[in-house]
């Protein structure tokens, strides 16, 4: 039964019952259909043009959805879901949206057949818990003391669907080296890989294979003046977040002067205030000064005389990373509690050397040998902006995946292997339950097959046949003890056959799969619980008051 009526107490439209659910499911299907064709190693790219005409060409689910201006509230849930997956895992954003939309579609069919949403939700929750347990107990492969090979394979799998898949060997090595070089142990003795310390710089020219890894944090700006030294070693770095310019009096300040000479004194004092600040900096031992704001010519003169490097207009984000890597404190003002201006030498960070180098046509400041945590930079080369942006997105995903693999130490086979195994397992599980949840779990099992199906369709292969074969292998693996190794059988999309993906090196971190299932189920449940939608209309009478 569906009602769509004006309720006298509500200033707005109200829709409830099946109508709303169908509408929500349709909206989610529409979002999922947009990213569906970009899944997998042979997925296609999307060209997005925003309102000012900027073009983005990408294959990354999170980027596509972020740039779509989605109006529908239920579809927005999926967009946020992709962003969450991007933050938590870094890859698998497309999969998570497709799975969530498929779960919703199937749940909606069940509701139409008079199964109550609450039964479906509890069935989905049970299926999710069982899936995660099954992955962790039966499907994962421990990668003891990870050598480089599994890491490189994980990075290659992540890149396989991106623009740089042709050079995935080359880039996978770059990524793994970059992640391993920022390895650190925190106070609790845990080994962490802060990939925020990996700076990605994009420079036009040459080919993608001319990209390289630089030891040191690269800032995309040059020295503020030519007279400054090209190299400072050892470096004491001050990170500032304010102007080093002549302090002008604020607007509205009135100064009454009787003597014209007083005017000159005021001007002189304005200049001296900046000079004193610079002297305090240099006295504290700073020989590299980075600021997010500007430095005027008068201030530069003092730095040149002192033989220090000053860099202005550094990005705030870069500044935070440099401060973290060198042990510096980002200083926003010199004034202390009493209003006195001081600069504590403890705020300085230290590095072995700071040099200016030329990369492509741009001057770049490199901070090498940082004190607290090591920092590296990936210098990407490429033909144009679109290509460089897409390379950066691909490398971001790969860096996240390698980090997750190192931290969790477990991998699973890719190419639809996990989804098929879970599907077969959950179908069997559903038949052992005598409750209503049985139907929901069977639908959950079917919904997971959407991943191998879409992979096969995108590769222009016969999806029905391939998925049937794949399920047969996994059924054998789960019923016959001597055929356990079949559980890592997945799709080989180049040849359109089934192969053992663990041996073929198509692997992903286990946590990526677990998170996809958890997030997709939670999102589907959130949307499934909605059975009433009230769109409020702005009350005119209040506006007039």
Swiss-Prot record:
It is found in: Cytoplasm. Pfam families: Cpn60_TCP1. It comes from the Eukaryota. PROSITE patterns: TCP1_1, TCP1_2, TCP1_3. Signal peptide: none annotated. Its main location: cytoplasm. Keywords: Acetylation, ATP-binding, Chaperone, Cytoplasm, Nucleotide-binding. The modification N-acetylserine is found at residue 2. GO terms for cellular component: cytosol. One of its GO terms (molecular function) is unfolded protein binding. Molecular chaperone; assists the folding of proteins upon ATP hydrolysis. Known to play a role, in vitro, in the folding of actin and tubulin. Belongs to the TCP-1 chaperonin family. Heterooligomeric complex of about 850 to 900 kDa that forms two stacked rings, 12 to 16 nm in diameter. This is T-complex protein 1 subunit alpha. It comes from Arabidopsis thaliana (Mouse-ear cress).
């Amino acid at each position: 039964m569906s009602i769509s009526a004006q309720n006298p107490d509500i200033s707005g439209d109200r829709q409830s019952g099946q109508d709303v659910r169908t509408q929500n499911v349709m909206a989610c299907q529409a979002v999922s259909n947009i990213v569906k064709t970009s899944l997998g190693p042979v997925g296609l790219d999307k060209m997005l043009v925003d309102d000012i005409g900027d073009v983005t060409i990408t294959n990354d689910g999170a980027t596509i959805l972020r740039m779509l201006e989605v109006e529908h509230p239920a579809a927005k849930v999926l967009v946020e879901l992709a962003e969450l997956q991007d933050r938590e895992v870094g890859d698998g954003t497309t999969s998570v949206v497709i799975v969530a939309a498929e779960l919703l579609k199937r749940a909606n069919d069940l509701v139409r057949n008079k199964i109550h949403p609450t039964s479906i939700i509890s069935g989905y929750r049970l299926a999710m818990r069982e899936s995660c347990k099954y992955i962790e107990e039966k499907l994962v492969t421990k990668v003891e003391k990870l050598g480089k090979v599994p890491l490189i394979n994980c990075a290659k799998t992540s890149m396989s669907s991106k623009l740089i898949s042709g050079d995935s060997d080359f880039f996978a090595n770059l990524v793994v080296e970059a992640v391993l070089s920022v390895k650190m142990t925190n106070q609790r003795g845990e080994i962490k890989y802060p990939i925020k310390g990996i700076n990605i710089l994009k420079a036009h020219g040459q080919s993608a294979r001319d990209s390289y890894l630089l030891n040191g944090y690269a800032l995309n700006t040059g020295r503020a003046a030519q007279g400054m030294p090209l190299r400072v070693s050892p470096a004491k770095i001050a990170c500032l977040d304010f102007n080093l310019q002549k302090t002008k009096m604020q607007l509205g300040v009135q100064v009454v002067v009787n003597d014209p000479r007083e005017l000159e004194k005021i001007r002189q004092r304005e200049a001296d205030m900046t000079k004193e600040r610079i002297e305090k900096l240099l006295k504290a031992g700073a020989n590299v000064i980075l600021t997010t704001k500007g430095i005027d010519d008068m201030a530069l003169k003092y730095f040149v005389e002192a033989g220090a490097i000053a860099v202005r207009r550094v990005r705030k984000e870069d500044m935070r990373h440099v401060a973290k890597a060198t042990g510096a404190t980002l200083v926003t003002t010199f004034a202390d509690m009493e209003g006195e201006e001081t600069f504590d030498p403890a705020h300085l960070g230290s590095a072995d050397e700071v040099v200016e180098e030329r990369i492509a046509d741009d001057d770049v400041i490199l901070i090498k040998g940082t004190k607290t945590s090591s920092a590296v930079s990936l210098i990407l080369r490429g033909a144009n902006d679109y290509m460089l942006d897409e390379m950066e997105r691909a490398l971001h995903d790969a860096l996240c995946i390698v980090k997750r693999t190192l931290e969790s130490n477990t991998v699973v086979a890719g190419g639809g292997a996990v989804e098929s195994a879970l599907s077969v397992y959950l179908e069997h599980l559903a038949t052992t339950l005598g409750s209503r949840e049985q139907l929901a779990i069977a639908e959950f099992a079917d919904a997971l097959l959407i991943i191998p199906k879409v992979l096969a369709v995108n590769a222009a292969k016969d999806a029905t046949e391939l998925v049937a074969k794949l399920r047969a292998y996994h059924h054998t693996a789960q019923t016959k003890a001597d055929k356990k190794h079949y559980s890592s059988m997945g799709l080989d999309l180049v040849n359109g056959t089934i192969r053992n993906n663990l041996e073929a090196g198509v692997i992903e971190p286990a946590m990526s799969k677990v998170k996809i299932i958890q997030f997709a189920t939670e999102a589907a449940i959130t949307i499934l619980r909605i059975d009433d939608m009230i769109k409020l209309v702005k009350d005119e009478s209040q506006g007039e008051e």
